[in-house]
């Protein structure tokens, strides 16, 4: 704990005399200030009052929700003793009152901020005391916000019925700075991506547009193939406004059908081919397609709606159909519909017009250093919005899209990137940490997004390749912000400055309340790049909002775009970049893929109607995963139960029974990345003071799970049979290196995915095994997830040779040698 003499003070501000009780007003406004600094569901305010040279210390439990009033805030429960969870908070916030400049002689511990309210010449004064040299900027922001609130509300009586979320306090300086950081013009491109591709085909017909595992296409070939398939669509009665789903594994044909759909005037609807058939059919019911594209086998097709025609004979169409008249381009027409997880249990489709996509692309070409020399890797499924950047932005720039095979990117990511000549890659930090720039000499830029950036990834790559931290949402279509080149001194949560949109920070419960510069609030995007909304105008929980009143009143000279509330909490840094602080709702991301935890819990209620199960993304050790917390207690009143993870045999059996009961139903309704990997038994689901699920506490509980407890929960055998031969010892050593544990703690019958492994760590195993002259692939691990079974499989396998279509339209022999 830090004694007071390590504290530093901000300047002292002289406040106007208030018509309210000074101490009561100060505590209320300081509580609001702190809430806008971190936006926790509940926290502890340490209150210090001086009398006769001595200090009295009490505590207030503060919980500010959307409906919380000033009166409720002032009546916050007072405690004489510190709550048991007070020491768990990231920062200590205190409010001190004294009749003089008497210093606060107390120990508050850790990083602390104390608002000291004093008096000078009959007028109140305020200063913020803070510990830690790095907290000066935050302390000044806190003092400025408090001062703005005092100036706005101190001269009139406090309205006890007024909701806290309506309490504003912008200073003239805040307005000036916000206008400065958002002063750029909102551009709007009136063009279509397929028209830009046509221009490239005319001006540079022989330049590579696609370099894929199954073949290459020049811009002339790409445009010609797309024209022929679009002509077929038009002749089949497909026209403007028709939705065409595409359920395809990555291939150069994937790029062709995207352009063909747009040229026909239709709407491209990408669907992940790994989705269960029930989810695909559910999307069909929302878009009512006449046809869909696929390159999947007949087994999947038989499960889909038979009334929708299937188009899969792309090569035959290109050979037999001559290009014909196509509908005129309309930049205001809908171009794409990306489906994402919905909180009501039903996926929702965000629709973008051509102009929005083109506008977003033009905004980011400069920050991402993309031009005709760009070779961008198409890594993600086309169903994810990142693919717009990978595909559309690359084509707009006149560059080349590099398409690795699915198995190739899993088993030899660096080799695939090297063979394709990749210069740009858009990756999640989890995947990026597997990239070795020394093995990919062409690689220049990696854009990191989709999940929080960790310092390990930053340190591993920033000196060898140009790293850019990026941020955006499905509703934005592309990226909203991008950082400068990351260095070892960069903060991973800094997402950089706007690439074009205006970025506003508003109150999480009231977008009509623009927050002071530097405080934490919900990130709101204003742009012409935004989606028009969701298909079917789904009104529930939409983030699309009309222009707030402050937008016209404070910034009347700025042209206006559309507005979207992201649900992300952020704050402005002094240089105009933005720092992220988590989410305000139940939306989460796992390995770059957006999920609504509410949609998963909706399925749990149907599958396990008598159980309470909460889904949450947690981190255990170095691994982030989607977990299901299974509540064991059936008591009505659980207030006296201290939530904890239960690892006794009965609790574990109960959680495993929940897994067995729910997994089939979840797997049939949700994509595989939305099915929990782990079921954690807890005696009680923790709640906040307001009665909501305390997700922060759940994440903390999960973080305390040890390796031994993890294996107990996953049903891993205590007995660890050790390797019997050299091959098993090699595999054990490889697993141990990747999972960061002692080799002796892994038995030959332990299941890889129950001892901390996942698909990403399986990719790492493949790479690590290669350095040990052991050649395996991810499919081998999936099919043989124990050391014993994998070693036996490798022993029984012979040398396999197969042909695949190479990077230059020639057959390449690939040999897998089994040691």
From Swiss-Prot:
Pfam families: AMP-binding (PF00501), PP-binding (PF00550). Induction: Expression is positively regulated by the cluster-specific transcription factor FGM4 and is induced during infection of coleoptiles of wheat seedlings. Expression is also up-regulated during infection of barley. The fusaoctaxin A gene cluster is silenced by H3K27 trimethylation by the histone methyltransferase KMT6. The modification O-(pantetheine 4'-phosphoryl)serine is found at residue 759. It comes from Gibberella zeae (strain ATCC MYA-4620 / CBS 123657 / FGSC 9075 / NRRL 31084 / PH-1). Pathway: Secondary metabolite biosynthesis. Residues 722-798 form the Carrier domain. This is Nonribosomal peptide synthetase 9. One of its GO terms (biological process) is amino acid activation for nonribosomal peptide biosynthetic process. The keyword Repeat applies. It is an enzyme of class 6 (ligase). NRP synthetases are composed of discrete domains (adenylation (A), thiolation (T) or peptidyl carrier protein (PCP) and condensation (C) domains) which when grouped together are referred to as a single module. Each module is responsible for the recognition (via the A domain) and incorporation of a single amino acid into the growing peptide product. Thus, an NRP synthetase is generally composed of one or more modules and can terminate in a thioesterase domain (TE) that releases the newly synthesized peptide from the enzyme. SUPFAM superfamilies: Acetyl-CoA synthetase-like, ACP-like. Belongs to the NRP synthetase family.
